[in-house]
From Swiss-Prot:
It holds the Pfam family PDDEXK_1. ATP binds at G8, R9, A10, G11, S12, G13, K14, S15. This is ATP-dependent helicase/deoxyribonuclease subunit B. PANTHER family: RECBCD ENZYME SUBUNIT RECC. Heterodimer of AddA and AddB. It is an enzyme of class 3 (hydrolase). One of its GO terms (molecular function) is 5'-3' exonuclease activity. Despite having conserved helicase domains, this subunit does not have helicase activity. Its EC number is 3.1.-.-. InterPro entries: ADDB_N, DNA_helicase_suAddB, P-loop_NTPase, PDDEXK-like_dom_sf, PDDEXK_AddAB-type. Belongs to the helicase family. AddB/RexB type 1 subfamily.
Length: 1150
């Protein structure tokens, strides 16, 4: 019985010493068991290394074990294990059930128990307790020593959960954490390790459970040799936590305590001093890094480095692209093998997709060493979404998550037809399961003939029944059961009914044929996992009564704990992984990417259920559990040391200065430390692009990425930019390669590509737009925004998918309709806006809205609680609006005369006719919300008001560019009709936008009702253009003094209008605007009919017409594509607009 330490710094040859010692023992033919004990994740590599040292005949004489393998060997030898193993999934499901049963008894975790991830947190703390040999009884016995209610109640809750978990678990099961506890007991009966010599390698620390096992082994074995990665032995002295080797020295001290307690001999240690160490014999730089990274003071390396390099990049993508180029270069120039290379990071989740994409492009074989979660696998999605459909009552999201798994007998076309119909009609809940066929006519933005409509509805119902039948049957079977095992049986029957096992097998075969071995392996494991989870539910809580929702939650919890590991498909490949999972020392070349602050070293972890203070307090009371986050942070430096000393030939550290979203990233403290040690370190960056052949050569690596660089340079050449001669030679290589020549020629032809088609034939455009042209004024404005968008919307009639929701236009139309009906009701009853009874008015608004809802004119407002709230808001807005209109009318002499005045063949006025230069007449149609009239001095003044549910400004600049024409053309048309039809001398009074809203007034505590009303009136002040006539202005606001709070006007003390602070125009200017608007509409319509469909969106300083355009995926507008340019509109001042309009009219002789 003895213990011997084999110690030395990283790379000193400790693992090799162990292997050589084993070889020597075999050659000496010593008759005792020889054991090599390593961590589980190192077992494969250790066996491989052992075989390389020993020959095939002698290799079997040594056992390579992990603690878990050792437990199984002993259990097989001495027996005693009758219970089955419960995996992490079963453990989580059991914990979920325990917490649900006891949620009302929990003092601290009652609310937390509902949070996602809580089960995992509880599972982790129970695992921790077991590893540290803490039982529920130990916790309960220590409760009286705990001060402070919060920690005491926490520990009471944990004791309750832990106690019930142990009781229910050990009826038929044990979990993985019980293995070592049982192993300690069984080792007394085992003979396997009697007089054995054991070598323990690659451990930096042990759990209390493992120390207990080691204690037993020390008492049974001949000798235990333990490797320690440290510069010197501590020999029981106090450990400085800032020492990089402090975790190792703590381990040494604990082992020394064990042998002292058991009177076990300590053999003379083996000190592996090296200069250089075996690993770094070919690199003085890496040896210097190992010695000085955590030495204080450090020794500076003055020479330029070639084995240690740094790379600073613009972002993560260019970082990985540069890494790929460097790997290719190393393999070509230095004959490096892919299997000798590793790429690691502290943020594998953030890097793995980029690495996969780039390495595939560069044809670098790689394997990402991580376990994959299974929640996104279609098989798991199908099972959970099927249950979610029933537990959440057939919501759109759950139904189509189920249908879109690709595992059902519904093709994509059928899926699209069904989904479009469901979205258009808001189908959910009972509508899926009732026996009546769906008969809603609204399933598309397009009109269909009756027969086609009937056929499509019949098809939709067929698809519906096919989609819902398996789930309806599942639901029916669920209703007659209440035990967990019965739920599992019914679910399994459902999976068989939809032929899922056969479909999975077919998919696995297809994946194998297509060479997707990883996918085949994944799907093969998933079905076994599903069966395992169902079996565990039956075994653990099979007889318990549960609801469907509980079954869904238990399954969800069970699946969430599973991760699948994949086997590397080939040996010669780059290993990609996390810094914490770096397994092999046989790595020549190591790339550490993402060496940024907060990534490597990793930041402090969250404290978890037990805070650092809790852990410290419990430790002081004798309850030793895992270290607090501060201690772990100190130990992180040993991980840094181990990582940096892994490669034997080449190390490169890289860091981006920004992430994928452009957020700034700072380099890690590791970067600055290494720069201090290596003053002339090899450092590159891709932020500043250098020119020259040497730089361009870096872009020539694998065929595919080099091809992309070639195309980029050829495009520059076409655009007249000088490129390096090297690309001419590269072009020739691809031109002579049969695989690439066709693709090369096709892309070169693409240099002439443009998405523009400025004009189409007049005949075709006539067929699309109709003849004679009948068009609304808003559509004319749409053409001014972008001719192509107009063409797609009104020519091709492309429309967005119809969805059952309430859009702003729908709501605006609804409110306009109610206001129109209310206005006519006023007229019918002989009432006036200024004198109407507000109580009656508000009741009338309620009545009109309720009638509309009863008539289902806007059925969606009856569809949910949310829309009931919207209805209430609409009522408040309209009530506020009629009050506001009444206030406006009280303040003036204009009288409302027309509501929803229409221009159309059957309208109040005929369409607005305009003659083009060709002699053709176009007809403009439209509708004015309200027209108020004022009889004054033998003239009739018009005030045209447009109701808006959003903010709308009046800008002369927009009039000039053809973006704001409606109110002016309506004014012109009404004045023309009054003169021609009735001989009335009409004059412009005002063009105004009135916002329909119920604004919130802040700080109303000290305000009277009158002050609040004034604030609302001011808040809803109308925007527009007013006649510059003080008398007419006073007829709109008879109490105006200074700035009006209802119209955009300010009057001076002398009664005149302050033109600089008002939006006004003279009669002459109104006349000019009328002429200009007519001229502009004619110009626009002629462009339209000539076939102009140019992709030319406008752009102003506050945005462009592309901002909310739904056709961007059609036009693919991109200023990098030839011919794609914005129509830049510069906001002009009013004076500039008047000058520009007058000049244009003079030029056209108008």
């Amino acid at each position: 019985m003895s213990l011997r330490f084999i110690y030395g710094r990283a790379g000193s040859g400790k693992s090799q010493y162990c292997l050589n010692s084993i070889k020597n023992r075999i050659e000496e033919d010593i008759d005792r068991p020889l054991i090599l004990l390593v961590p589980e994740q190192f077992s494969f590599q250790a066996e491989k290394n052992l075989i390389e040292v020993l020959d095939e005949k002698t290799g079997f004489k040594t056992q390579v074990l992990s603690f878990k393998r050792m437990a199984y060997r002993v259990f097989n030898e001495v027996g005693g294990i009758t219970a089955k193993h419960m995996n992490e999934s079963g453990k989580s499901m059991l914990l979920y059930n325990i917490i649900e049963d006891n949620k009302n008894n929990l003092k601290v975790f009652k609310k937390a128990a509902k949070r996602q991830g809580f089960i995992t947190t509880i599972s982790d703390i129970i695992t921790e307790f077991k590893r540290y040999n803490i039982t529920p009884e130990i916790i309960l016995n220590n409760l009286e020593n705990i001060e402070g209610d919060n920690l005491k109640y926490k520990m009471e809750d944990l004791a309750l959960i832990f106690s019930q978990f142990e009781t229910r678990l050990h009826k038929n099961y044990i979990d993985n954490e019980d293995d070592l506890t049982i192993l300690v007991e069984k080792l007394n009966k085992s003979k396997q390790f009697d007089n054995a010599e054991i070598w323990i390698d690659e451990f930096s620390s042990f759990s209390p459970q493992e120390y207990s096992v080691l204690e037993k082994l020390l008492l049974k074995s001949y000798r235990i040799n333990i490797t320690l990665c440290t510069d010197y032995l501590n020999q029981g002295r106090f450990v400085d936590t800032t020492d990089v080797f402090s975790p190792i020295k703590n381990t040494e001290n604990k082992l020394l305590q064990i042998i002292e307690d058991n009177n076990i001999k300590l053999d003379k240690p083996i000190a592996l001093k090296c200069d250089p160490c075996a690993r770094f014999k070919n690199s003085a730089e890496l040896q210097h890094l190992e010695k000085n990274m955590f030495s204080f003071p450090y020794k500076e390396y003055k020479n330029e480095t070639k084995d240690i390099c740094m790379l600073k990049t613009l972002n993560q993508f260019t970082e990985i692209e540069n890494t790929a180029k460097d790997i290719i270069k190393l393999c070509i120039d230095k004959g490096c093998r892919f299997k000798d290379i590793a790429v690691i990071t502290g943020d594998l989740e953030g890097y793995e997709n980029i690495i996969s994409s780039v390495f595939l492009q560069y044809n670098i074989p790689f394997f990402i060493d991580k376990k994959r979660e299974i929640n996104n696998n279609p098989i798991i999605v199908l099972i959970l979404s099927a249950l979610e459909v029933l537990s959440k009552n057939w919501t759109y999201e759950s139904v189509f998550r189920y249908l879109k798994t690709g595992l059902l007998d519904i093709n994509n076309e059928e899926m699209d037809i069904l989904e479009n119909y469901v979205l258009a009609n808001g189908i959910k809940g009972y509508q899926w399961t009732n026996d009546k066929p769906w008969e809603h006519k609204s399933f598309s933005n397009y009109e269909l003939e009756d027969q086609a409509l009937k056929e499509l509805l019949a098809k939709i119902n067929d698809i519906r029944y096919k989609a819902m039948e398996p789930i309806v049957t599942l639901n029916k079977n669920f209703k007659s059961i209440d035990k967990a095992k019965e739920f599992c049986e019914v679910l399994y029957e459902f999976l068989c009914n939809i032929n899922l096992p056969d479909k999975i097998q077919n998919m696995i075969e297809d994946f194998k044929v297509e060479g997707e071995i990883e996918k085949a392996s994944e799907y093969n494991q998933i079905w076994n996992i599903v069966m395992e989870v169902l079996d565990q539910i039956v075994e653990v809580i099979g007889e318990e009564k549960i609801s469907l929702k509980e079954f869904f939650k238990i399954l969800q919890t069970g699946f969430s704990e599973y991760e699948i590991g994949l086997i590397p498909p080939t040996l010669d490949q780059v290993m990609v992984g996390s810094i914490t999972r770096l397994r092999s020392h046989n790595i020549n070349t190591l790339y550490i990417v993402g060496v940024n602050d907060g990534i490597f070293p990793s930041p402090l972890k969250e404290e978890g259920i037990l805070s650092d203070d809790d852990r410290e307090f419990l430790g002081d009371k004798g309850l030793e559990i895992a270290k607090d986050t501060k201690s772990i942070a100190f130990e992180e430096q040993f991980l840094v040391y181990s990582t940096l000393t892994t490669p034997s030939k080449y190390l490169r550290l890289s860091y981006p200065i920004a992430d994928g979203e452009g957020k700034t990233l700072r380099p890690s403290i590791i970067i600055s430390r290494i720069k201090k040690i290596f003053a002339n370190i090899c450092e590159e960056n891709d932020i500043v692009k250098l020119n020259g052949e040497e730089e361009e050569l870096k872009n020539i690596s694998s065929a595919k990425p080099t091809f992309n660089y070639l195309i980029s340079n050829l495009r520059k050449d076409v655009e007249g930019v000088k490129i390096d001669n090297i690309w001419g030679d590269t072009y020739k290589w691809y031109l002579e390669n049969e695989f690439w020549i066709e693709k090369l020629n096709r892309l070169i032809k693409g240099f002439d590509y443009t998405n523009q088609s400025k004009y189409i034939e007049t005949k075709k455009i006539r067929n699309l737009y109709g003849k004679p042209l009948k068009i609304s004024v808003s559509r004319v404005e749409k053409f001014s925004q972008c001719p192509f968008a107009y063409f797609v919307q009104y020519g091709l009639k492309a429309k967005d998918r119809k969805i059952f929701n309430l859009s702003y236009p729908d709501l605006g139309i609804f409110m306009h309709s109610i206001l129109e009906k209310f206005s006519h009701e006023l007229e019918k009853k002989g009432l006036e806006w200024g004198t109407m009874d507000l109580n009656w008015a508000e009741e009338e608004i309620d009545k009109l809205i309720n009638e509309e809802l009863d008539n289902k004119s806007l059925d969606i407002l009856n569809s949910s609680k949310r829309y009931e709230y919207v209805t209430k808001s609409v009522k408040k807005i309209l009530k506020r609006s009629i009050w506001l209109i009444g206030e406006h009318i009280k303040r003036g002499n204009f009288k409302p005369s027309y509501y929803e005045l229409s221009f159309d063949i059957d309208g109040d006025y005929p369409p607005i006719a305009m003659e083009l230069h060709s002699g053709e007449v176009i007809n403009l149609i439209g509708r004015v919300d309200r027209v108020d009239l004022l009889q004054k001095d033998g003239a009739t003044y018009l005030k045209i008001i447009d109701y808006k549910s959003g903010i709308k400004e009046f800008k002369l600049s927009d009039v000039y560019y053809g973006l704001q024409l409606q109110l002016l053309i309506y004014l012109d048309a009404i004045l023309t009709e009054l003169a021609e039809r009735s001989g009335i001398n009409g004059e412009p009074g005002a063009l105004l936008y009135l916002k329909l809203d119920d604004p919130i007034v802040k700080n109303t505590v000290d305000m009277s009702d009158e002050e609040i009303e004034k604030s609302i009136i001011k808040n809803l002040k109308m925007k527009g253009l007013i006649l510059n006539d003080p008398n007419v202005i006073r007829d709109m606001d008879n109490i105006i003094s200074g700035i009006s709070d209802i119209i955009p006007v300010m009057v001076k003390k002398d009664g005149g209008v302050s033109e600089g602070r008002s939006s006004v125009a003279t009669k002459e200017e109104f006349e000019t605007l009328r002429k200009y608007v007519r001229y502009t509409i004619i110009e626009i319509c002629e462009e339209m009919l000539e076939g102009n469909i140019e992709i030319k969106p406008y752009k102003k300083k506050d945005g462009s017409s592309c901002d909310y355009c739904i056709y961007s995926s059609v036009c693919k507008f991109d200023t990098n594509i030839r011919g794609n340019k914005y129509n830049i509109l510069i906001d002009k001042k009013d004076e500039e607009v008047w000058d520009a309009i007058k000049k244009k009219l003079e030029y056209k002789n108008i």
